[in-house]
Amino acid sequence: MERRAGSRLRAWMLLLLLCPVQGRQKDSGSKWKVFLDQINRALENYEPCSSQNCSCYHGVIEEDLTPFRGGISRKMMAEVVRRKLGTHYQIIKNRLFREDDCMFPSRCSGVEHFILEVIHRLPDMEMVINVRDYPQVPKWMEPTIPVFSFSKTSEYHDIMYPAWTFWEGGPAVWPLYPTGLGRWDLFREDLLRSAAQWPWEKKNSTAYFRGSRTSPERDPLILLSRKNPKLVDAEYTKNQAWKSMKDTLGKPAAKDVHLIDHCKYRYLFNFRGVAASFRFKHLFLCGSLVFHVGDEWVEFFYPQLKPWVHYIPVKTDLSNVQELLQFVKANDDIAQEIAKRGSQFIINHLQMDDITCYWENLLTDYSKFLSYNVTRRKDYYQIVPRRLKTEL
């Protein structure tokens, strides 16, 4: 009974957040008409997804597996393994086996955690899982071959899976995250506690970004911050590739800032790095308004996050960033509602159960396209569950 009442309350709150925004700001006027119209269209076209059986993301699985509807042959799989495009795994009689070679052991471990969570319900299969940053199957490649990657653009046929960072193996940032980002379930709790300490009205209204220069697409925001520090507080930090101040646009590197301390700010920026950015999902849980720059790189959950509904979309060259910041400052209640919708989506649809469920649905559907019986490779060793980690 309580669960039904809770579901009705959440549905009512969602309907309230999805109400059209036109005419609700006294001074919006024609100055902001373009943005207000985009928000209204986005809300009118938005269809909230179900929380049942992680069906929210089923369309992503379906689209990623479409190229393989003709079947995956033993010969095709042998070619993928031969080309070393990732780590080769086999699931046989509800046991997980792997070749010895893995470029990033902690990343493989993060992947294996989720497979082992559902392995007792999985049929026999084999697959190649890429734990590099970059996808491996460009669309011009013929024939299309099955490789699992955590992120891609529309130019690739890789099959997306939930990244290892939901458990472990994320980027190490010393001294904040010396063993890397991980344990999404624990991190969620930390971020939500910080968000409660920094409600919207207490947040600093200066836009905020801290990160390393993994992509020059971030440069315009750093330069804007130097020109107008009251509008934007954005600085480069060091990463493993840092050699001199040239790598931080001629200024000393800033100190790294814990993600929970980002919650002090009302407007947070997300950029792609080498591929999709791991910080994206974290920013929403601050209850802040996320400015998402560019839309080329995606992870499996991105397609259900909609521009103007859950975040503010920013052009890749940042040519519209100042106008967007002026808009949200002039329309604070609208900005807050977008932030709430973004936060609620991640809270409701990106729980650890959703990650595990996605892995199970993805591998189960994928296995149906294998046109042969998998034979265990004798030199592969069995992966067994490790002791549960209870700290980040």
Swiss-Prot record:
Residues 1-23 form the signal peptide. The active site is at 133 (proton donor/acceptor). It catalyses: L-seryl-[EGF-like domain protein] + UDP-alpha-D-xylose = 3-O-(beta-D-xylosyl)-L-seryl-[EGF-like domain protein] + UDP + H(+); L-seryl-[EGF-like domain protein] + UDP-alpha-D-glucose = 3-O-(beta-D-glucosyl)-L-seryl-[EGF-like domain protein] + UDP + H(+). Disulfide bonds join 49-56, 54-357, 102-108, 263-286. A motif (Prevents secretion from ER) lies at residues 389-392. GO terms for biological process: axial mesoderm development; circulatory system development; gastrulation; muscle tissue development; paraxial mesoderm development; positive regulation of Notch signaling pathway; protein O-linked glycosylation; protein O-linked glycosylation via serine. Residues 103-107, 172-178 are annotated as: Interaction with the consensus sequence C-X-S-X-[PA]-C in peptide substrates. Glycans are attached at residues 53, 204, 373. GO terms for molecular function: EGF-domain serine glucosyltransferase activity; EGF-domain serine xylosyltransferase activity; glucosyltransferase activity; UDP-glucosyltransferase activity; UDP-xylosyltransferase activity. Keywords: Developmental protein, Disulfide bond, Endoplasmic reticulum, Gastrulation, Glycoprotein, Glycosyltransferase, Signal, Transferase. This is Protein O-glucosyltransferase 1. The lineage of its organism: Eukaryota, Metazoa, Chordata, Craniata, Vertebrata.
